[in-house]
């Protein structure tokens, strides 16, 4: 059972994948967004290639727990992904995932240019990792 983690942004979608047992998350790729149809096709290819059975999408919340300004866009994307793949995505609180990813990359002394290339993939990995940890305890 592999789980796909997505960090959906305006320009890029960070993608992470779990191992077969659903215990660990690894960054997989970054999809540079062009159109909804092409984005969905790219994700579907990944789902089919890796035999993904579950999809987790980072859900943008404000620090007080309310839905963030991008929440409706992410919900709309999730609905379209469900229609396209038949897999109903699970939402996972992504508060501070990008901030945490940035801190990890800075602490690893990664240059700003390199950080821009991998931050979305790392954010997706953190989202997926949080979800997998939760599932393993419940």
Swiss-Prot record:
Any single Gene Ontology cellular-component annotation: cytosol
InterPro entries: RNaseH-like_sf, YqgF, YqgF/RNaseH-like_dom, YqgF/RNaseH-like_dom_sf
Pfam families: RuvX
One record GO biological process: rRNA 5'-end processing
UniProt KW keywords: Cytoplasm, Hydrolase, Nuclease, Ribosome biogenesis
Gene3D superfamilies in the record: YqgF/RNase H-like domain
Function: Could be a nuclease involved in processing of the 5'-end of pre-16S rRNA.
Protein name: Putative pre-16S rRNA nuclease
């Amino acid at each position: 059972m592999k789980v796909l983690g997505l960090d959906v942004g305006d320009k890029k979608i960070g993608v992470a994948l779990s191992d077969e047992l659903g215990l660990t998350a690894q960054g997989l790729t970054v999809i540079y967004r062009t159109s909804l149809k092409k984005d969905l096709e790219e994700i579907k290819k990944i789902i089919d290639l890796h035999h993904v059975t579950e999809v987790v999408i980072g859900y943008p919340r404000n620090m007080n727990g309310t839905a963030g300004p991008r929440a409706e866009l992410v919900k709309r994307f999730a609905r379209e992904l469900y229609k396209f793949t038949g897999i109903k995505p699970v939402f996972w609180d992504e508060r501070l995932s990008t901030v945490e990813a940035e801190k990890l990359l800075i602490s690893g002394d990664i240059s700003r240019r390199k950080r821009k290339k991998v931050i979305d993939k790392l954010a997706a990995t953190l989202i997926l990792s949080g979800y997998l940890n939760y599932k393993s305890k419940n």
